[in-house]
């Protein structure tokens, strides 16, 4: 049904996100940079548009001052954590995924064909661009 909707509904359009100013921050819930990387891998391969809320790409956490929830998700960008280390590498990972997505319009706007369930694999194709994605599992 998923592929059928993507492939045949001319009005199909979706905008996906993992965090927003109205939700909890993904990193704030899980505190796991490796999980944030895996989420980025899946997220940046979704069809349609993707909305990256500031800090999704850098593991930005909620404010620690006990403020109101709405303000906690609007905390300052975690610039001081991005000079080096795990969070800097996370940003580089998101940048690489963004460049890949930008270079392959089939990811966001291509026809979708599932190849297998285990490992999960699919092909997306748009005009001359064709991408095959295989989720082989996660690195422990």
Report residues per predicted region.
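Substrate-binding cleft/loops of secretory-pathway carbohydrate-active enzymes
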Residues: 1, 61-71
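Alpha-amylase-like alpha-glycosidases and glucanotransferases acting on alpha-linked glucans and related
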Residues: 1-48, 58, 107, 115-118
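Aromatic- and carboxylate-lined catalytic core of secreted/periplasmic carbohydrate-active enzymes
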Residues: 3-4, 73-115
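Extracellular/periplasmic catalytic domains that process cell-envelope and extracellular macromolecules
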Residues: 6-10, 44-46, 68-71, 124-128
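Short, glycine-/Ser/Thr-/acidic-enriched flexible segments
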Residues: 22-23, 57-59, 84, 127, ...
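Short helix/strand-capping turn motifs
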Residues: 49-53, 67-75
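Carbohydrate-binding surface patches
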Residues: 99, 114-140
């Amino acid at each position: 049904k998923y592929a059928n909707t993507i492939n045949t509904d001319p009005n199909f359009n979706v905008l996906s996100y993992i965090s927003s100013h109205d939700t909890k921050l993904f990193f704030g819930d899980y505190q796991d940079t490796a999980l944030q990387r895996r989420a980025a891998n899946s997220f940046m391969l979704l069809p349609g548009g993707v909305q990256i809320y500031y800090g999704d790409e850098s593991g930005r956490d909620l404010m620690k001052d006990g403020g109101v929830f709405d303000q906690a998700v609007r905390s300052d960008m975690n610039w001081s954590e991005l000079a080096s280390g795990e969070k800097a590498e996370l940003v580089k990972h998101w940048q690489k995924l963004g460049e890949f997505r930008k270079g392959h319009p089939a990811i966001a706007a291509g026809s979708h064909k599932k190849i297998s369930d285990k490992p999960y694999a699919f092909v997306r194709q748009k005009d001359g661009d064709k991408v095959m994605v295989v989720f082989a599992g996660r690195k422990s």
